[in-house]
Amino acid sequence: MSALRPLLLLLLPLCPGPGPGPGSEAKVTRSCAETRQVLGARGYSLNLIPPALISGEHLRVCPQEYTCCSSETEQRLIRETEATFRGLVEDSGSFLVHTLAARHRKFDEFFLEMLSVAQHSLTQLFSHSYGRLYAQHALIFNGLFSRLRDFYGESGEGLDDTLADFWAQLLERVFPLLHPQYSFPPDYLLCLSRLASSTDGSLQPFGDSPRRLRLQITRTLVAARAFVQGLETGRNVVSEALKVPVSEGCSQALMRLIGCPLCRGVPSLMPCQGFCLNVVRGCLSSRGLEPDWGNYLDGLLILADKLQGPFSFELTAESIGVKISEGLMYLQENSAKVSAQVFQECGPPDPVPARNRRAPPPREEAGRLWSMVTEEERPTTAAGTNLHRLVWELRERLARMRGFWARLSLTVCGDSRMAADASLEAAPCWTGAGRGRYLPPVVGGSPAEQVNNPELKVDASGPDVPTRRRRLQLRAATARMKTAALGHDLDGQDADEDASGSGGGQQYADDWMAGAVAPPARPPRPPYPPRRDGSGGKGGGGSARYNQGRSRSGGASIGFHTQTILILSLSALALLGPR
């Protein structure tokens, strides 16, 4: 044995030693040339970066082994890694913000322009049919469209009041024109309005047109307003949600992920994909918007389908003039019956002296120029678009948004600055401590799974307060859109009192037909208070605007709104309350 010892000593240097372990790149590569090159290009002073590895006992985040970073360099890299992460998150979601903002602008412009087109069409129709008579009373019609725009823009009163006042003013102007031989002082017109607004519906001077016009306009404008508000809410919520605050634990994990390879002198060694996913999911764990985001997108699509279907904004806007014209034709054709009722209730009017008497205006057929828009002739705006095209474009873009928050960590880690390509899983990568393979388990993004995140401590109580508030905003917008799709206004006005609450507009197709059978009348409501001051005249003293087809939310709708508000209140408590 003693004779073999010299031979063993000669062979020992030829035997291979142990393979490189974690941190061995510091022993193999003692130069900081690559780090100096990368950081120098970023504007770092080379005086702060040593040419070779030094002791890392001064480091606070990176492993305290051999390093190329001073304390100042490490702190600067921490700030840069935070900025890189924030920028990637915002860039990943920028298409959401831009898409929702662009769709909001396009739909808003379209709805407003369709109202302008409807006003222009009515002006042309009535100018040709009534000529000078329309010109004398054009302010009534212009006022109607102005108040419709105010309601759509959230600055006007309810549509019931708007339409009731319009029909009242129209009756007060038109009825004297049918009887130029009589004088109708203000007191008599007040009696006329009171009679027309009586709850028994005995006098319907414009037939069923006011009810059908109110039903169409209210359901359509409520839906359009909720839809545009929903797009605006989504844009604001996403814009705020993408501004991710970085906690101290997240900041340190990001530094270990993409900053520490520079300090170890191996900037070309990319972080492992699993390492990146754990860090990013931990940083985003309390700030996702699912599942409320998916429900919000569903609400947009449901309401968009209604707006190009049973609640068609195009057909509603284009039919305003038709419904008003039908009402005027009904009054002319039934003037004898209507006048007899008025004269019986309000008394015979005083005759006009013969020298002041005007000739009656010619009766012309008001609707002769009108032709309904066919499927092949969808009205377009000045921009050459129509609602069908806008909804198709919206549907295509919303499909790309679905699941965005669930995929956000994969999107961020797919950037070359954050992690190695997932296809290179078998190749060595940066594990947080050195070169090798990432062995800890990759956890999911839910709060329950993030409790076991190996890279940073995550609050298991769920979303933070700002995120809960944003999710509640999405829930409120979704509830408003889905309620509008059922023909109701969540803000308090019942937009669909003549249709079933569960049908959401199944009766609406009948309302397009002139002369459609009206649904059964509801129980009479108490008369409305006077809308303007005035002393009593013939037929009674109180004043009341004509209110044909006008109604407030009844008991059924009150229960509907109470239930919806209760659901939102419970959602708020669930989101904002303690976990």
Swiss-Prot record:
Stretches with biased composition (Pro residues): 520-529
Protein name (Swiss-Prot/TrEMBL): Glypican-2
Cysteines engaged in disulfide bonds, as pairs: none
Positions where lipid (GPI-anchor amidated glycine) attaches: 554
Region: Disordered, residue numbers: 444-468, 485-555
Transmembrane segments: none
Propeptide: 555-579
Pfam families cross-referenced by the UniProt entry: Glypican (PF01153)
Membrane topology label: Lipid-anchor; GPI-anchor
Function field: Cell surface proteoglycan that bears heparan sulfate. May fulfill a function related to the motile behaviors of developing neurons.
Keyword Membrane included in the entry's annotation: yes
Subunit record text: Interacts (via heparan sulfate) with PTN; this interaction promotes neurite outgrowth through binding of PTN with chondroitin sulfate of proteoglycans, thereby releasing PTPRS of chondroitin sulfate proteoglycans (CSPGs) and leading to binding with heparan sulfate of GPC2. Interacts (heparan sulfate chain) with MDK; this interaction is inhibited by heparin followed by chondroitin sulfate E; this interaction induces GPC2 clustering through heparan sulfate chain; this interaction induces neuronal cell adhesion and neurite outgrowth.
GO terms of biological process kind: cell migration; neuron differentiation; positive regulation of neuron projection development; regulation of protein localization to membrane; regulation of signal transduction; smoothened signaling pathway
UniProt keyword terms in alphabetical order: Cell membrane, Glycoprotein, GPI-anchor, Heparan sulfate, Lipoprotein, Membrane, Proteoglycan, Secreted, Signal
Subcellular location: Cell membrane
Residues spanning the signal sequence: 1-23
